[in-house]
Amino acid sequence: MHRIAVPAATGAPTAQAPVKVAARNLDFYYDKYHALKSINIEIPEKRVTALIGPSGCGKSTLLRIFNRIYALYPKMEARGEVLLDNENILSPKYPMNRLRSKVGMVFQKPVPFPMTIFENVAYGIRHHEKLSKADMQNRVEQALRQGALWDEVKDKLGQSALGLSGGQQQRLCIARAVALRPDVLLLDEPTSALDPISTSRIEQLVEELKRDYTIVIVTHNMQQAARVSDYTAFMYLGDLIEHDRTETIFSQPSKQQTEDYITGRFG
């Protein structure tokens, strides 16, 4: 497996990490609009990679290609390759159910299902696996613990998830995503609708989750990118301008566009 240099999870000297996801000469079209242009990027395993850039730059589009969610909509086309463990997930031969189980996603706005807290987490598991009642209970508890929510909901698993606070709902969505034990977790501006306290809790959770998952996060908050990510990619108008260690991007960017953006002189 190809490896790239990234910061060690502990902040220790540079360590070698396998490449988990790689885009190769990736182009994307919304009908005739060329939204992404020859993107080449490598996402290291069990690290956090942040995608930053102004609105409309293509960062959320790139994120959604990583689990082919665009396939739900007409007149959208991806060209090139996206390799997950060296397999091209854009190939028609790559099973969608397999992709959904290997790549989880959490959206900007919390979207709990209109069912109990327990059933929110169990829903996806039932779609992909057949577990005994005891095994299902254990899996749900494990996911809620990983989502840092178990202690808050363990006595009300039968209550509606819609009664949770916004921050709790987002952590429930994270628990629901990790319940399938995916390899990759995609986070599309997961804290933009949350208060500062809930945002801080999610950021702490991301730091904990990268021990088990490869994480890609889209954020408009550059301070957040600096806090939570090991790698950062700056995008503009469908191009990948620069991709490097987060500390390098924010302290010694190699591209003037990157420096202008992170210092507020962009425009």
UniProtKB/Swiss-Prot annotation:
Ranges where the ABC transporter domain occurs: 21-262
SUPFAM superfamilies: P-loop containing nucleoside triphosphate hydrolases
Secretion signal span: none
Keywords assigned by UniProt, alphabetized: ATP-binding, Cell inner membrane, Cell membrane, Membrane, Nucleotide-binding, Phosphate transport, Translocase, Transport
Compartments where located: Cell inner membrane
InterPro entries in UniProt: AAA+_ATPase, ABC_transporter-like_ATP-bd, ABC_transporter-like_CS, P-loop_NTPase, PstB-like
Any one GO MF annotation of this record: ATP hydrolysis activity
EC code: 7.3.2.1
One record GO biological process: phosphate ion transmembrane transport
The UniProt record lists the keyword Transcription regulation: no
Membrane topology: Peripheral membrane protein
A Pfam family assignment: ABC_tran
Enzyme category, top tier: translocase
GO cellular component, one term: plasma membrane
Reactions it catalyzes: phosphate(out) + ATP + H2O = ADP + 2 phosphate(in) + H(+)
Residues involved in ATP binding: 53-60
Quaternary state and interactors: The complex is composed of two ATP-binding proteins (PstB), two transmembrane proteins (PstC and PstA) and a solute-binding protein (PstS).
Function: Part of the ABC transporter complex PstSACB involved in phosphate import. Responsible for energy coupling to the transport system.
NCBIfam families xref list: 3a0107s01c2
Family label: Belongs to the ABC transporter superfamily. Phosphate importer (TC 3.A.1.7) family.
Name listed for the protein in its UniProt record: Phosphate import ATP-binding protein PstB
Native source species: Xanthomonas axonopodis pv. citri (strain 306)
